[in-house]
């Protein structure tokens, strides 16, 4: 396994110390962390599933909710970490780059990106315009920005169209906050987070900033070309700035995100001192609510998104092309690539209150995606190498620029309608669908049906059916002249048809949800090997099924417990996914402080060694803890330990030959002081 070169800190002592601190207090009043009881949690609004306010008991979907109070107590910093506490979700760190933390829902992830999950922030889509994934545009989304998180498992195309394939993540951001937080920790972690809100001239403004930098952790990896051990690191830095303005029914939002990393892996290859990448996302949105029909609330949203991704890598080792280049050169084949895309979205939606028992939602959405740049400068000929044309021309240090994408565009129009009705006091019906029309691809209709029955005061039953599709992205279709990965212009939609049956039990101190699901995939888009390179294709029909359990328990006035478990029967193509996952969270809250211990588990997975064989990676538990103390005058201290036991957890690669998988970071310690004013 990869060796992690970090000092063996006394994690057990740290954990025991925190436990002793917890047991030493006998305060009678609860801190705000437990202000929201399990019974109250059942009535937290859920809006991402139907575009109307539902609750956990009535929403026609498999949903997990995290409120601000719950997020505050977790020993986690980023969205991809928290998703490990959701049934059916799991994370994967791959070798695309040092920031490549991706996630999947219900065992479906065919590339190094989360193409099958849609990410919404305040109702706006932020998936990458050209590659279709949210984890590229926002690889490390800070939890500090989130007021409420809704994680929906299952198809969402009946409302959102393509990419809402196996899940939808709906983030509602924090508003009207004033705070400043400073943190320092392992790998010289330096972090600043701040909120500011102000009312000026009738406009309410909300500002957020997140700035982060660390020196990275040292790892011993196998060199991608020689196979010999090398020492590398994964330093990173990030800047996120959000500004939201609102006056009455009018809203404007502007977001900027930038992230950088170097060394480690880049596009599955090592190259210390050369590997580097940086990405930049701009997102601006305007929304206006109004009434133009009786009993109907309407909204228009116009958004624009621009994304840049620049990276440098070695394609071959020094000397590899010495006998196959003209003029002959022993220089490594390096590439300096730039990818960029932009998207426009316009949505017109309506919520019609028909009567006391029923409502209808309908609307239209137009989207235009364009790959505005896809080129790379290299010192050898990309085209000749990609097509096996030897000798390959050598251009020296100046290099030559080659296209690596078709710089095409893709547009679609979607029409959706949904009908909600209380058939009787205990039965709620959801019926809807959406038709999407594409310029270059066949149209697709995605239906949904949901029945929610309140069996009694304790139990409720949900029977759900939905279909979703995912259109091939501009990157999957148009990637060219790439010796590592190339596109397939003949790809078609992939389709999933899903059944869910969910039983919920709710008692005064206990919430329990047990669900079973079945997915049937038609024309699934797969990543396959052609020699050592990869490409995409529509594969044969596949099926998966599973069980998801979520349990929350208030043990006493101060103690609470939450746990999840997932078991899935997955197709052979999902060898990179864990068939079993689980998590637990133990929390103790008192008047001034809070202590939390959480852990998540991922079963064995496989990483590809040859086009026809895989290597099994060990399963692992990851444990985190956090202790918070609230001083007077709004000051708060947070001590956090991630990966308490320094577990050497590895996750699967996309390319061949990485016997040990991709290493994750070891133990990380940090201290943070926050001032709320």
Ranges and model annotations:
Residues 27-72:
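Short, acidic, small-residue-rich periplasmic hinge/interaction motif at the N-terminus
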Residues 158, 170, 183, 195-277, ...:
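Periplasmic-side early beta-strands and strand-to-turn transitions of outer-membrane beta-barrels
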Residues 125-153:
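Short acidic/polar hinge/loop motifs at secondary-structure boundaries
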Residues 45-64, 80, 84-125:
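Extracytoplasmic beta-strand/coil segments of soluble accessory domains associated
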Residues 422-429, 516-521, 537-609, 640:
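Gram-negative outer-membrane beta-barrel transporters
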Residues 14, 197-199, 235, 239-241, ...:
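Conserved C-terminal beta-signal and adjacent last beta-strands/turns
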Residues 244-260, 279-441, 454, 510-516, ...:
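Face-selective signature of the C-terminal outer-membrane beta-barrel domain
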Residues 273-291, 339, 404-410, 460, ...:
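Outer-membrane beta-barrel signature, preferentially recognizing the C-terminal barrel domain
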């Amino acid at each position: 396994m990869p060796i992690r070169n970090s000092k063996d800190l006394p994690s057990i002592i740290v954990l025991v110390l925190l436990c002793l601190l917890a047991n030493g207090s006998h305060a009678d009043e609860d801190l705000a962390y437990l202000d929201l009881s399990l019974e109250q949690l059942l009535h937290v609004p859920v809006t991402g599933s139907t575009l109307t306010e539902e609750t956990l008991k009535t929403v026609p979907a498999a949903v997990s909710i995290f409120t601000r109070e719950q997020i505050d107590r977790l020993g986690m910093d980023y969205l991809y970490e928290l998703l490990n506490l959701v049934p059916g979700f799991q994370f994967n760190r791959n070798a695309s780059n040092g920031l490549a933390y991706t996630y999947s829902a219900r065992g479906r992830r065919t590339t190094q990106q989360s193409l099958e999950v849609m990410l919404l922030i305040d109702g706006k889509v932020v998936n990458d315009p050209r590659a279709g994934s949210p984890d590229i545009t926002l690889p490390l989304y800070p939890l500090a920005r989130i007021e409420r998180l809704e994680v929906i498992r299952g198809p969402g195309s009946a409302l959102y169209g393509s990419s809402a394939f196996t899940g939808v993540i709906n983030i509602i951001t924090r508003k009207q906050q004033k705070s400043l937080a400073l943190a320092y920790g392992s790998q010289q972690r330096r972090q600043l987070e701040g909120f500011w809100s102000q009312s000026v001239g009738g406009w309410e403004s909300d500002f957020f900033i997140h700035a982060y930098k660390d020196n990275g952790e040292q790892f011993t990896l196998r060199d991608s070309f020689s196979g010999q051990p090398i020492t590398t690191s994964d330093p990173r830095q990030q800047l996120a700035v959000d500004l939201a303005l609102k006056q009455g029914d009018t809203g404007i939002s502007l977001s900027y995100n930038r992230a950088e990393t170097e060394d480690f892996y880049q596009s599955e290859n090592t190259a210390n001192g050369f590997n580097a990448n940086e990405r930049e996302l701009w997102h601006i949105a305007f929304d206006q609510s109004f009434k133009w029909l009786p009993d109907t609330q309407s909204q228009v949203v116009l958004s624009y998104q621009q994304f840049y991704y620049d990276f440098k890598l070695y394609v071959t080792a020094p000397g590899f092309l010495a006998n196959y280049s003209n003029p002959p050169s022993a220089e490594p084949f390096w590439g300096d690539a730039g990818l960029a895309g932009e998207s426009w979205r316009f949505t017109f939606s309506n919520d019609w209150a028909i009567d006391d028992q029923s409502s209808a939602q309908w609307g239209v959405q137009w989207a235009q995606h364009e790959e505005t740049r896809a080129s790379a400068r290299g010192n050898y000929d990309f085209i000749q190498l990609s097509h096996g044309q030897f000798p390959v021309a050598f251009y020296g240090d100046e290099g030559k620029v080659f296209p690596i994408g078709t710089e095409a565009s893709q547009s679609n129009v979607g029409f959706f309608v949904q009908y909600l009705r209380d058939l009787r006091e205990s039965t709620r019906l959801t019926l809807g669908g959406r038709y999407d029309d594409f310029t270059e691809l066949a149209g697709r209709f995605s239906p949904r049906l949901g029945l929610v029955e309140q069996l009694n005061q304790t139990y409720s039953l949900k029977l759900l059916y939905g279909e979703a599709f995912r259109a091939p992205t501009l990157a999957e279709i148009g990637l060219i002249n790439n010796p590592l990965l190339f596109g397939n212009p003949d790809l078609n939609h992939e389709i999933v048809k899903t059944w869910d049956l969910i039983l919920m039990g709710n008692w005064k101190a206990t919430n329990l949800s047990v669900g079973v699901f079945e997915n049937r995939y038609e024309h699934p888009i797969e990543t396959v090997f052609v020699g050592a390179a990869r490409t995409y294709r529509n594969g044969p029909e596949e099926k998966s099924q599973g069980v998801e359990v979520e349990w929350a328990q208030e043990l006493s006035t101060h103690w609470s417990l939450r746990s999840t478990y997932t078991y899935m029967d997955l197709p052979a193509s999902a060898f990179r996914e864990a068939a079993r996952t689980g998590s637990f969270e133990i929390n103790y809250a008192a008047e001034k402080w809070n202590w939390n211990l959480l852990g998540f588990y991922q079963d064995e997975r496989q990483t590809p060694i040859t086009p026809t064989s895989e290597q099994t990676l060990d399963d692992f538990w990851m444990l985190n803890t956090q202790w918070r103390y609230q001083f007077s005058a709004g000051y708060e201290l947070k001590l956090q330990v991630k990966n308490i036991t320094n577990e050497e957890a590895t996750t699967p690669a996309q390319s061949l030959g990485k016997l040990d998988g991709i290493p994750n970071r070891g133990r990380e310690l940090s201290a943070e002081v926050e001032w709320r004013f």
